[in-house]
């Protein structure tokens, strides 16, 4: 999962499936014929993306896998973070993953299929045993864009503190090649509750996402079968597989409310949710889950980068999802270098209505306050130093991830200036930041231009004493400053 340096542009959501180790999502949602089947009333799904919480970082050697975790017999949780080696972290809650890390998987011996590292991608309880699905790399020369990927199965009898390798379960059709990323890997695994485990994997040679499955009764080496040309009939070891469609990522889960498989992926404007009722044919939610601007993998850069996103259940930490999810991802803030990397957990609440809902997706706008910097920061993004030194002050409604359908809306940007001698974060209309010499950080989202049912006003305010802008739902700016203008109307809930 290491990535070769290079000047090329990558979009801000990255999925580890392409030739250099990451998949740069296209600028348009694309469809090659496989992404076609519709979920029952996909327009009836309502999603609210909540507060981001930074659990680990900054550090360069974290968050290089799809984060995975299990619940322990005592009710606590054990998460697994990887960066060549895999580390176990214990916490009281699924998102409480800031504690000490201990190494549980290491790079293999020279010449082995895991000589460059073992990244635990998914931990699956099976009785008192934990199944570990491990991403491996060998023949790596990361500075030249070269590595060779595969997946193996390991088991643990002590809840992930030690592992026994049972061998490879998924390999590609190609061999290690100088200057190229080859093989198949970066898989996530889920129990389809139909007697099969399903794997969704990246194939670097063509940027494809592919599927394989194995019986729950025996998911070991030689029992995985890939999906190829409409059938499950190609061996997991060395067999061919059909691409499931452009725009998909390899981060999968199962939504227990309807039994559907859910993949994260890319659609126009941001990170998307894709649903399937047959494990192989996916349809996207019409609105992005998160708004994401184009980003640059090579750091530092003015853009931000989200990588290795995965969905976990907010109560159990597994990937059998209730209606309360966590979106977990690696994060590089704008203008920061590679060493400023964070692991972020974000609440996502999902529900199904009996009729179509508009808008479907809303992302929480939170306001943080750092008294030492005299900075109030109204943002939809993760805030380095969240909870200390930045304290959560209030929540100001939800921003839409696309322009309001059929109704005038306003696109808002998140930006910052250092002119007062400290950060002055500003939420403003698109174009305002550059016109007023603020550094643009990101697209924050959209608000309605006029009041709509279940919306709240959103004002841009200014505190003259602190020389700090902020957003508020109150016309008197909660007596923290004075209103400069009405930005629009955010979703109330």
Feature locations, PLM:
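Extracellular glycan-binding segments that recognize GlcNAc-based cell-wall polysaccharides
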Residues: 358-493
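Beta-rich carbohydrate-recognition and catalytic domains
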Residues: 26-116, 125-178, 193-249, 255-301, ...
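Secreted/luminal cysteine- and crosslink-motif detector
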Residues: 21, 42-45, 117, 141, ...
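Bacterial N-terminal signal peptides
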Residues: 10-21
């Amino acid at each position: 999962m290491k990535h070769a340096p290079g000047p090329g542009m990558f979009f801000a959501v990255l999925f580890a499936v392409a030739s250099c180790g990451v998949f740069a999502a296209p600028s348009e949602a694309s469809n090659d014929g496989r992404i076609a089947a519709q979920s029952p009333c996909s327009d009836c799904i309502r999603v609210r993306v909540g507060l981001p919480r930074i659990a680990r970082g900054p550090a360069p050697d974290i968050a290089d896998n799809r984060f995975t975790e299990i619940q322990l017999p005592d009710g606590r949780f054990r998460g697994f973070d990887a960066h060549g080696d895999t580390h176990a972290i214990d916490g009281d809650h699924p998102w409480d993953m800031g504690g000490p890390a201990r190494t549980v998987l290491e790079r293999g011996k020279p010449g082995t299929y895991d000589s460059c590292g073992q990244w635990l991608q998914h931990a699956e309880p099976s009785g008192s045993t934990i199944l570990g699905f491990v991403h491996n790399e060998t023949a790596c020369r990361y500075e030249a864009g070269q590595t060779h990927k595969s997946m193996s199965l390991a088991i643990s009898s002590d809840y992930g503190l030690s592992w026994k390798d049972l061998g490879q379960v998924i390999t590609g059709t190609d061999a290690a090649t100088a200057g190229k990323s080859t093989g198949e890997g970066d898989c996530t695994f889920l129990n389809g509750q139909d007697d099969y485990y399903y794997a969704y994997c990246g194939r670097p040679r063509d940027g494809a996402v592919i599927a394989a499955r194995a019986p729950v009764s025996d998911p070991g080496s030689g029992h995985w079968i890939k999906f190829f040309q409409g059938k499950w009939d190609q061996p997991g070891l060395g067999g061919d597989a059909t691409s499931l469609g452009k725009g998909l990522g390899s981060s999968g889960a199962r939504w227990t409310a309807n039994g559907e498989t859910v993949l994260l992926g890319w659609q126009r404007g941001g990170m998307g949710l894709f649903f399937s009722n047959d494990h192989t044919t996916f349809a996207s939610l019409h609105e992005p889950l998160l708004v994401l601007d184009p980003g640059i993998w090579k750091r530092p850069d003015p853009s931000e980068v989200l990588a290795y996103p995965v969905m976990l259940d907010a109560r159990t930490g597994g990937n059998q999802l209730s209606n309360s999810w966590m979106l977990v991802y690696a994060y590089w803030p704008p203008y920061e270098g590679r060493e400023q990397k964070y692991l972020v957990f974000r609440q996502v609440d999902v529900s199904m209505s009996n009729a179509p809902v508009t808008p479907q997706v809303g992302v929480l706008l939170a306001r943080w306050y750092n008294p030492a910097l005299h900075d109030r920061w109204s943002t939809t993004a993760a805030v380095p130093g969240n909870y200390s030194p930045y304290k959560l002050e209030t929540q100001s409604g939800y921003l839409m991830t696309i322009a309001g359908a059929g109704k005038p809306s306003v696109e808002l940007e998140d930006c910052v200036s250092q002119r007062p001698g400290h950060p002055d974060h500003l939420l403003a209309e698109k174009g305002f930041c550059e016109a007023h010499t603020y550094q643009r950080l990101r697209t924050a989202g959209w608000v309605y231009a006029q009041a709509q049912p279940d919306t709240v006003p959103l004002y841009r305010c200014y505190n003259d004493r602190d020389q700090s802008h902020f957003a508020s739902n109150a016309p008197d700016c909660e007596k923290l400053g004075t209103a400069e203008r009405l930005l629009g109307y955010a979703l109330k809930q």
